[in-house]
Design a protein with these regions (language model features):
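Non-catalytic, conserved peripheral segments adjacent to functional cores
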Residues: 1-109, 130, 142-220
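Conserved metal-binding segment of the jelly-roll/cupin
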Residues: 106-129, 136
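Extended, polar beta-sheet/loop recognition surfaces of beta-rich domains
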Residues: 135-137, 143
């Protein structure tokens, strides 16, 4: 992205984008999403199959959500109105950072965005009324492949902001703890996530080799 910074998060497989905002007396402009920048860090172009829009009042928590891998569901998340505390959770069984989380404030001032690769858990808490979150998803809605972990699981210990009573959907309130989800075999395996990523990179490499006008030379 022109003038934007795409930095790896503390959790492997996630990135934080801080865009450069161009402002004048008319308003402002920024590049919110640019495929080639994510392709450069992922090693393959990200898929976009569905765009979601959610509006939440202050205190609402959505998540922790994740999907079976493969194919999983990568997400590119931004808050276009108000503010949320966005949380990346490593729920990949076997990962060195399993059970860890990172919180990032997303709002309509800095306009930052977060990308989460397939296999990571995602949640956020609305810090303002009418907090509006827009996110791109690599796969469409498939309820049979989607799961959750309770966002208030004390063992997970996400430090949600105080001052607002957490508001959860019935589904999220009934979600298992991280340990319960692990014992039930619901969590994606770190090895499966890595294999999925490597397969995507290999497919992209083969597709590039087969582009018209490009010649693969022997021994190269």
């Amino acid at each position: 992205m022109t003038g934007s910074r795409l930095q790896p998060a503390e959790i492997e497989g996630a990135w934080i984008c801080t865009p450069r905002i161009f402002g004048d007396d008319r308003g402002s402009f920024l590049e919110w999403f640019r495929e080639e920048d994510l392709s450069a860090v992922l090693g393959y172009p990200p898929d976009v199959a569905q765009a979601n829009w959610s509006v939440s009042r202050r205190g609402v928590i959505r998540g922790v959500h994740f999907a079976d891998v493969p194919p999983g569901q990568a997400k590119y998340v931004s808050c276009v109105r108000g503010a949320v505390l966005d949380v990346i959770v490593d729920i990949r069984d076997g990962s060195r950072s399993y059970g860890r989380w990172q919180a990032v404030r997303l709002d309509d001032v800095d306009r930052r965005a977060v990308f989460l690769s397939e296999g990571l858990g995602h949640a956020f808490m609305a810090l303002s009324d009418q907090a509006t979150v827009m996110y791109l998803c690599s796969t469409g809605y498939a309820p049979g492949r989607e799961h959750g972990v309770h966002p208030l699981d004390p063992a997970l210990g996400i430090a949600w902001p105080s001052g607002a009573e957490p508001v959860l959907s019935g589904k999220d309130a009934a979600a298992p703890t991280l340990d319960e989800a692990r014992r039930a075999g619901l969590l994606p395996g770190y090895g499966d996530c890595q294999a999925f990523t490597e397969r995507r990179r290999a497919e992209h490499g083969r597709a590039r080799q087969g582009r018209p006008g490009e010649v693969s030379l022997p021994g190269r």
